[in-house]
Amino acid sequence: MVEALLEIHDMQDTDPDADRLGVMVRNSTGGFTALSGNQVGALITDFLFRKRKASGRFSPQDYVVETLVTTPLTREIAVHHGARCFYELLVGFKYIAQTMEEQGTEHFVFGTEESIGFLAGSYCRDKDASVAALYVL
């Protein structure tokens, strides 16, 4: 069992209704460090844009959405990839969902809040830790 634990590179956990995702990664001392919602959101944002570009599905109309308490790094990643970012929204995923409705879902890539809430896809209008966890793997 100890050997198996030593090989773990990251740990993930959700709250009971699986709408928030916590992530810990192995650090240089062999322990684990918790990532903030901002860090996880930035990593997923970059990953999704890279995958879209690699598969030929990227469009400059693609966009991510973040609320005003979320790091500006998400916006910088979107700009770096040549995409759009809607930011400075009021706190709450209902405002991310509202932006999806206003902008259309065809080019929606990702919604994120610093409170470890993520949505990767347009299949729903609320946080989904299950799909976000797959992207962290």
Region roles according to the model:
Residues M1-L137:
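Phosphate-binding chemistry for phosphorylated carbohydrates and sugar-nucleotides
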